[in-house]
């Protein structure tokens, strides 16, 4: 009865008890979303006999061993009892904000729970890093400007060798010589992320790089190669860039109207005029033909124009002697 009364005092609201705060009996643990909780409960001061161990969460002033964690595949938590060291190891993986709260590690003796150790778990949201932000906005960023990329030159035995893999969304790739008649005057700022591997001597580092250029530093693509500064750890590299460009629809909209479109308009106009003249010529030919045909018909039908009836030829008889 005494242990049950002790547990009731521990779970009682702070305003109803005098003395030290109820929070002082909990060990505070602060973790981020996605991390793993790993705590230990010791029972060295108790008799060495086989007892069950329970990990429960406080809900409505009650300790519930069957609290739910529906987002976890597999067991909700892992409890390992080391009887020789008299230590209970509790592990909870894939923490979420819903896991925040108060937990108790208890002994189960003949169906009665005895508290061993309490924990106050605070789970905070994981901060958004610069690594995943460009991937969600990369498509919108690349649609509004021209991106030039290049590789840093290497020289000397101690010069760093940098390789990069850049992620671009599908778009229109245009070489500068295809747009010789069009020269963009300005470029919109852009940002992209490159996963790079840098090695210098025996050291080898991997990291994520974010490169950003502002519109004020942009120049004409035909003025010469540009340079982009990248930084990974304590290594800074300044590299020239090549002329392969990703252009947007706004650049193509500035292009002058193509000659083929003008030729199509002229061809349509000429075709209409020719067809109209052809119809007029057919009407005129039909009129002349009809006029001649009606004139010849009237001459044939007039009785005055017919030949007079011929007289009968004289009858001549010839006798042979």
From Swiss-Prot:
Topology Cytoplasmic: residue spans: 290-321
Cell location: Cell membrane
Organism listed in the record: Homo sapiens (Human)
UniProt keywords, alphabetically: Cell membrane, Disulfide bond, Glycoprotein, Immunoglobulin domain, Membrane, Receptor, Signal, Transmembrane, Transmembrane helix
Task of the protein: Cell surface receptor that may play a role in the innate and adaptive immune response. Acts as a counter-receptor for CD276 and interaction with CD276 on T-cells enhances T-cell activation.
Superkingdom of source: Eukaryota
Ig-like V-type domain mapped to chain residues: 20-121
Tissue and organ distribution: Detected in cultured B-cells, T-cell leukemia and monocyte leukemia. Expressed constitutively on CD8 T-cells and induced on CD4 T-cells after activation.
Gene Ontology molecular functions: signaling receptor activity
Coarse class of the protein's main subcellular location: membrane
Stated name of the protein: Trem-like transcript 2 protein
Disulfide bond residue pairs: 41-105, 56-63
């Amino acid at each position: 009865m005494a242990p049950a009364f002790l547990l009731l005092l521990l779970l009682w609201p702070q305003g109803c008890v005098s003395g030290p705060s109820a929070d002082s009996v909990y060990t505070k643990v602060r973790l981020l979303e996605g991390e793993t909780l790993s705590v230990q409960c010791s029972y060295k001061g108790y008799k060495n006999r086989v007892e069950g161990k329970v990990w429960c969460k406080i809900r409505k002033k009650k300790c519930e061993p069957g609290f739910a964690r529906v987002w976890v595949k597999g067991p909700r938590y892992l409890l390992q009892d080391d009887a020789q060291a008299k230590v209970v190891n509790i592990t909870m993986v894939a923490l979420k904000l819903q896991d925040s709260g108060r937990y108790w590690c208890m002994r189960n003796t003949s169906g009665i729970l005895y508290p061993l150790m309490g924990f106050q778990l605070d789970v905070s949201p994981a901060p958004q890093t610069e690594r995943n932000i460009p991937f969600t906005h990369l498509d919108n960023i690349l649609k509004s400007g021209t991106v030039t990329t290049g590789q840093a030159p290497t020289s000397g035995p101690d010069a760093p060798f940098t390789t990069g893999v850049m992620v671009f969304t599908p778009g229109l790739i245009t070489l500068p010589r295809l747009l010789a008649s069009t020269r963009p005057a300005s470029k919109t700022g852009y940002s992209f992320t490159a996963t790079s591997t840098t090695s210098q001597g025996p050291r080898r580092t991997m990291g994520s790089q974010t490169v950003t250029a502002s519109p004020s530093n942009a120049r004409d693509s035909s003025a010469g190669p540009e340079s982009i500064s990248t930084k990974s750890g304590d290594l800074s590299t300044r590299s020239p860039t090549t002329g392969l460009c990703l252009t947007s629809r706004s650049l193509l909209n500035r292009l002058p109207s193509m000659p083929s479109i003008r030729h199509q308009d002229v061809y349509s106009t000429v075709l209409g005029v020719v067809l109209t003249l052809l119809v007029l010529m057919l009407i005129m030919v039909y009129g002349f033909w009809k006029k001649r045909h009606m004139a010849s018909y009237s001459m044939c039908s007039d009785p005055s124009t017919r030949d007079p009836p011929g007289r009968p030829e004289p009858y001549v008889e010839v006798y042979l002697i």
